């Protein structure tokens, strides 16, 4: 089964950072990385859960909520398996 990327986590992080008026440099400093790494994060559809957790804590915003909502929608849309 092919995995669908309905949620683009990198774009969500970039949008939230902008809404909060925080800079890429600020997030890079908080993560302990170079700002080019943050720009690379913005380009990713998905992230390692540990990195997403760190970013969620740093930015005080639970990015997992978006994934949970989308996952539940996909579960609900999936047909029930046929009983034997």
PLM features per residue range, with description:
Residues 67-84:
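Short, charged recognition helix plus adjacent turn
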Residues 21-22, 47-50:
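Residue-level signal for the short linker/turn that defines the boundary of a DNA-recognition helix
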Residues 32-47:
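Recognition helix of helix-turn-helix/homeodomain-like DNA-binding domains
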Residues 50-66:
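DNA major-groove recognition helix of helix-turn-helix/homeodomain DNA-binding modules
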Residues 27-28:
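Short alpha-helical "recognition helix" segments of helix-turn-helix
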